[in-house]
Design a protein with these regions (language model features):
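Start-transfer (signal-anchor) and selected internal transmembrane alpha helices
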Residues: 1-39, 248-253
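Membrane-helix interfacial "entry" motifs
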Residues: 6-18, 87-88, 115-123, 148, ...
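Membrane-embedded helix bundles of polyisoprenyl
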Residues: 26, 126, 131-143, 148-234, ...
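Membrane-interface coil-to-helix junctions
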Residues: 30-133, 157, 161-169, 173-179
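Transmembrane helix-loop junctions in multipass membrane proteins, especially transporters and channels
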Residues: 41-42, 115, 195, 231-239
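Intrinsic-disorder/low-complexity, polar/charged segments
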Residues: 48-49, 104, 148, 178, ...
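Transmembrane catalytic cores of multi-pass membrane glycosyltransferases
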Residues: 50, 57, 61-68, 216-229, ...
Length: 254
């Protein structure tokens, strides 16, 4: 009984240790990478797609959400505006914002943030997405029986602070969403294959689907490939026996 208890406590202890170590290491690495912005009081919004598209959509979504809440509290009616002539020559709001903001749970915070502080919240959330990506990668490593906390921490930092990761922080922040969801989807597949409940997989599929349809089909494709690979590796002995049986059957026929 004591051996079983110690076996259960070890992953929890390693998980807490990883969380603290990774959080501290991420703060240090983020400060080293972006200290120039902090010193010069600059945001992480680049003057191209980041400013014209993503940040504009972030601010618009916050204003859009506040207007819905104001209407709800003042008139006690839930009114969802669906068309805005200020978007180009006029466009559907939900269709336009779905690619940029609507669906990402973190962007809901823009509703509670005044427009004058939106740039700071936008920059903070951009880094927070990378932080979550490292956590999800670490969780996947633990399910693969990798219990070396320091190694997983280093791997998570490498996964996050790549050229791609540092590029998307200022250019396309929501490009970090696949980095968060993919390890969780693969983790969900591993849990289902181990006979555990599929709650994590279901929730991750739901969040990935509503966050961005463009990345969702890519995530679905890679998850399917990983699932096939997992099944092939897990039932390799069955395939070997089937091959031997097939060869013996052909030998008997001849």
């Amino acid at each position: 009984m004591s051996d079983k208890t110690s076996t259960l406590k070890k992953p929890i202890k390693n998980g807490k240790k990883f969380f603290l170590l990774y959080s501290a290491a991420f703060l240090v690495c983020a400060a080293l990478c972006y200290f120039w912005f902090i010193i010069n009081k600059k945001t992480l919004i680049i003057n191209s797609d980041g400013w014209r598209q993503h940040f504009a959509a972030f601010v618009y979504f916050g204003k859009y959400g506040r207007e819905i809440l104001e209407t709800l509290f003042e008139t006690h009616k839930f009114v969802l505006p669906q068309w805005d002539f200020s978007i180009g020559l006029g466009s559907d709001i939900l269709t336009t914002l779905h690619f940029y903001a609507i669906g990402d749970p973190l962007d809901l915070l823009s509703i509670a943030c005044p427009a004058k502080y939106a740039a700071y919240l936008y920059s903070l959330l951009s880094l927070f997405r990378l932080y979550l990506a490292g956590l999800s990668f670490g969780a996947f490593c633990f399910i693969k029986k990798q219990n070396h906390v320091s190694s997983i921490t280093v791997g998570s930092l490498v996964y996050v602070f790549t050229l791609f990761g540092m590029f998307i922080v200022s250019h396309h922040p929501f490009f970090a969403l696949p980095m968060i969801f993919l390890p969780l989807l693969l983790l969900g597949v591993e849990q289902i294959a181990a006979g555990k409940r599929p709650y994590l997989f279901i929730v991750t599929v739901f969040l990935a689907a509503i966050s961005n349809f463009y990345f969702f089909y890519m995530l679905a494709l890679f998850t399917a490939i990983y699932t096939l690979f997992l099944l092939v590796c897990r039932y390799r002995h069955v395939q070997k026996r089937l091959l031997e049986f097939s060869l013996k059957s052909q030998a008997v026929q001849f």
